[in-house]
Amino acid sequence: MTHLQAGLSPETLEKARLELNENPDTLHQDIQEVRDMVITRPDIGFLRTDDAFILRFLRARKFHHFEAFRLLAQYFEYRQQNLDMFKSFKATDPGIKQALKDGFPGGLANLDHYGRKILVLFAANWDQSRYTLVDILRAILLSLEAMIEDPELQVNGFVLIIDWSNFTFKQASKLTPSMLRLAIEGLQDSFPARFGGIHFVNQPWYIHALYTVIRPFLKEKTRKRIFLHGNNLNSLHQLIHPEILPSEFGGMLPPYDMGTWARTLLDHEYDDDSEYNVDSYSMPVKEVEKELSPKSMKRSQSVVDPTVLKRMDKNEEENMQPLLSLD
């Protein structure tokens, strides 16, 4: 075991070996292989290339070097292309702070039986007068940044439960194509987290309709991990034991305290210390120690999968139109 695996329990070490192909004997070589690819994307400012940071991406992609680098590139490209989202990217930012206080997201104290962190969202808590959907996405991304520092969660991953109770048609009408795409790109395509399941409960018909619209834009692996339970909490309990769930989900624990995770972040004054601005992303790519092969040096080679969603032009009016009309 190397110092990079110091935070893992023996059980998680074995899981990383069997499920993620993690090998302590080649760990530093694996990391360097990914780091050496940075020079193939001079259009991106890679603000972090340290061992611990790259390791997150290798674990998220089961130590497939090229896939890990593609995710790393998309991580920084997403931030580079959405600079406004990452200005004041900290828990004390007014929009993020209010979203956190309303439980966007929440985090249960107990892990599930696979060691995964359970995140919860109560959609109806969104107060449109105080913060935006983008603020909610920022709060979720900031929370994931804090949680993913735990090496156990890098290996075991997360589960998300979204309760759609009392989420109104008017609120749903704010979910524009551009907003949904921003969320999909940020969470599915650009973040080194392993999501083992996304559970919808108490979803109304119009949320089911929205899911039908966005489903083609989700990766097959993501689609297989989304479960629409409706009002059938028994089906949820077959996948997540009720002993660790709050009463809102038919569990045996007391009602969830919406401010629990917010207090954790605010007490530690957590923020992402990366400088997300135009200057930082225009800095030259750092020199790497090892020379790359001629094939990997081809600058015309893109690491972005052409099947990944093409980013919408923010000026395209149709992308700002609601998927559900109130008319």
Swiss-Prot record:
Signal peptide: none annotated. This is Clavesin-2. Residues 96-257 form the CRAL-TRIO domain. Binding to PtdIns(3,5)P2 is not required for localization. SUPFAM superfamilies: CRAL/TRIO domain (SSF52087), CRAL/TRIO N-terminal domain (SSF46938). The CRAL-TRIO domain is required for targeting to the membrane and for binding PtdIns(3,5)P2. The modification Phosphoserine is found at residue 325. Residues 287-327 are annotated as: Disordered. It is found in: Golgi apparatus, trans-Golgi network membrane; Cytoplasmic vesicle, Clathrin-coated vesicle; Early endosome membrane. Its main location: Golgi. One of its GO terms (biological process) is lysosome organization. Required for normal morphology of late endosomes and/or lysosomes in neurons. Binds phosphatidylinositol 3,5-bisphosphate (PtdIns(3,5)P2). It comes from Homo sapiens (Human). GO terms for molecular function: phosphatidylinositol bisphosphate binding; phosphatidylinositol-3,5-bisphosphate binding. It is a peripheral membrane protein. CDD domains: SEC14 (cd00170). One of its GO terms (cellular component) is endosome. Forms a complex with clathrin heavy chain and gamma-adaptin. Keywords: Cytoplasmic vesicle, Endosome, Golgi apparatus, Lipid-binding, Membrane, Phosphoprotein.
